[in-house]
Amino acid sequence: MPSSAQNVGIKALEIYFPSRYVPQTELETFLGASAGKYTIGLGQQNMSFCDDREDLYSLALTAVSSLLRKYAIDPNTIGRLEVGTETLLDKAKSCKTVLMQLFGDNTDIEGVDTYNACYGGTNALFNAVNWIESSSWDGRDAIVVAGDIALYETPAARPTGGAGCVAMLIGPDAPLVLEPVRGSCMKHVYDFYKAYFKSEYPLVDGQFSNTCYLGALDACYQRYQAKQRARQAAKTNGTAISNGHQGSFLDTFDYFAFHAPNCKLVAKGYGRLLFNDFKLESGSFDEVPAQVREADFAASLTDKALEKLCVSLTKERFVQRVEPSLTAPTNCGNMYTASVYAGLISLISNVPSDRLQDKRIGMFSYGSGLASTLFSFRVKGDTTEMARKIGLQDRLSARTAVSPEFYDQMCKLREKAYQQRNYTPEGSVESLAPGTYFLVHVDDAYRRKYDMKPYLSMCEDRHEQAV
């Protein structure tokens, strides 16, 4: 039996996003929106998308095969594989079983799929960590996959789409250690759901969903704080805070990554944390603004003036602690389950390893319906090699911009392909980056066949074969 695992967390990270994107400035014009509505109003710059050549399975195959290749991971060292997604292609067969093709003769791998809107990846992460910390652990590592394609039918929601997949190697002695405290909020609401099975488009109440997100954040933050204080673990990091405030619970987090339906909502969410501190620990501040002091918690969720005030009061901290996590979200759009982990990848790509050591990274994961958790990582190892292997900025820069008209055509192509059998995709293989898996054909029995676009070098990897 292996000895008890210590410092369990993320040992390696990989991200995949499609090779083409549509600029949000051009989408504003195409959809008849005012200039800046998407870029300033939503905080989005570009949006990734897929044609009918890519789907959840291809995204996950690409991300996991790349993780195995870049980090030279022996498939036999993996004992658990979990997938979090809401982009379902089959109501019975899991995406995890499709990924088993990458693991050769190693069929002794636990785990399946988890789904609840954008939250499934986080639940998969917790499952993997709990397995490694349990008496059932056999000494091997786990891989967690979070990936989705976000696509909306109505013009108002179109700019909040996106696509991407994150693969994480989970194990002991990790540089990103999952801390034990977390606060969760689970409720029954209909803010966003996919009950109409004849379309991949969701049913959405956008404003209500934003309110649900912020209300869940309140509850998770308060519960995390209460549990952390109960463990006598909460302490400030000694960082000077603007507006003369220092010592609030918000300052126990050196950095923060949020689930990002859009980056403007992230800024509102971060401001909301300070509002909670003002209300719940007013003694930590020299002065609490009257507008905050008099606000009711429930009514404050839709108070735009209060929202602006809190965003303004946290602006300096936001730039230092949260903005580094927004590179992928603002350039790729909403990746649903992968979103918060794309934020984590952005953070370690933008902040040098030496500045991250022993820092706490707050994480807020939200999935409509709803399921949410606020948790944290403590950095206890070098992240330099991880950031180098990811190569986030270079890969973002290597993408190709397309027109909104072309994007609209690809949306129609996906509509045509949805739930079809005897179907051969029409999308371009040439546009895909080397190492990308793509759909070749769906046969008469709905069985899907994939292949991989080869790397430019002649070197072949044993994990990357036609499947």
UniProtKB/Swiss-Prot annotation:
Transmembrane segments: none annotated. InterPro entries: HMG_CoA_synt_AS (IPR000590), HMG_CoA_synt_C_dom (IPR013746), HMG_CoA_synth_N (IPR013528), HMG_CoA_synthase_euk (IPR010122), Thiolase-like (IPR016039). It catalyses: acetoacetyl-CoA + acetyl-CoA + H2O = (3S)-3-hydroxy-3-methylglutaryl-CoA + CoA + H(+). The keyword Amino-acid biosynthesis does not apply. It comes from the Eukaryota. Pathway: Metabolic intermediate biosynthesis; (R)-mevalonate biosynthesis; (R)-mevalonate from acetyl-CoA: step 2/3. The keyword Transcription does not apply. Its EC number is 2.3.3.10. Belongs to the thiolase-like superfamily. HMG-CoA synthase family. NCBIfam families: HMG-CoA-S_euk. This is Hydroxymethylglutaryl-CoA synthase erg13A.
